[in-house]
Regions:
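Alpha-helix termini
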Residues: 82-93, 157-162, 197-205
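Class I S-adenosyl-L-methionine
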Residues: 227-265
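S-adenosyl-L-methionine
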Residues: 1-91, 95, 125-163
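Conserved SAM-binding loop of SAM-dependent methyltransferases across substrates and taxa
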Residues: 103-116
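Conserved SAM-binding motif I beta-strand of class I
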Residues: 118-123
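Class I SAM-dependent methyltransferase core
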Residues: 98
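S-adenosylmethionine
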Residues: 161-234
Length: 265
């Protein structure tokens, strides 16, 4: 439990080498919420408060407390995806792919808004893969989580050609986010355009909706370059506070527009 010597639970502390891969206790999750948001219930995951998901057996690492897509953001992302998915031809089948699955909460919320869709996640880091595998199993979530580098495995676990693909792209930002310039989408790890290249190589004939998590402040040039890659795009920033500012998504579609349902940038 917290005492007078307990450090401030913020981004720097949770990502520190000594703390980042430790399993955090419930009081620590609530302290991070209180210290960073003024709300001990801020780290809501899988549709539950911290107390609820902890009681269900869900456990997370210190870094996941900060890095996970929290429920309010996940819900808004899922709503936007469902809005675009509704414009696909009747009877369309959807596969949702998250190459940087982490907690799988972003994937969880997109699937929640796309009933019947299949979910596939990739996670490179063993500690996070092990933790998230146990969590989604305890929740009975319809997500297939694969351990390894998505770049090497994407083609081995591809959805059929008839599927509409939703690609949720939320790679580590690392130093791509700066207080001065905002988020540089060309400096994420890996750059967003490189990830798009991989998906276009594997899913060259599938309709794809790219859903890229973004910050409220974006370096203009990489954003503009990325948007030129898509046949249609839309930028949405949500009024939901985060540890470093508001987050949102850049939606970008390829081959989704056969019916002319998506127009403009």
């Amino acid at each position: 439990m917290a005492n007078a010597d307990t450090p401030h639970y913020d981004r720097d502390f949770l990502l520190s080498p000594a703390k980042r891969n430790q399993i955090v206790e419930l009081w620590e999750v609530e302290k991070f919420g209180r210290d960073s948001f003024g709300d001990p219930g801020a780290v809501s995951l899988y549709g539950m408060t911290p107390g609820q998901w902890h009681a269900r057996g869900v456990r997370i690492l210190a870094r996941t407390t900060l890095e996970a897509v929290r429920d309010p953001l996940g819900n808004r992302i899922g709503e936007d995806v469902a809005r675009i998915a509704a414009r696909a031809p009747p009877g369309s089948v959807f596969g949702v792919v998250d190459p940087f699955a982490g907690s799988c909460n972003g994937l969880f919320w997109i699937l929640r808004h796309l009933p019947g869709a299949e979910g596939l996640g990739f996670e490179f880091e063993q500690a996070i893969f092990d933790m998230s595998s146990r969590n989604i199993e305890s929740l009975g979530a319809s997500i297939k989580l694969v351990h390894g580098d998505y770049g090497k495995l994407l083609g081995q676990h591809r959805f059929p050609g008839a599927h509409h693909i939703v690609a949720f792209l939320a790679p580590p930002w690392a130093d791509a986010l700066s207080a001065k310039a905002g988020l540089d989408l060309g400096r994420t790890k890996p750059p967003i355009e490189n990830i798009v290249d991989e998906f276009e190589r594997i899913y060259s004939n599938n309709p794809i909706l790219y859903v890229t998590e973004v910050h409220e402040r974006l370096v203009p040039e990489p954003l503009a370059a990325l948007r030129t890659r898509f046949e249609w795009s839309e930028l949405n920033v949500y009024d939901i506070p985060g540890p470093t500012g508001r987050h949102g998504v850049l939606l970008g579609a390829m081959r989704w527009n056969a019916s002319g349902a998506l127009t403009g940038r």
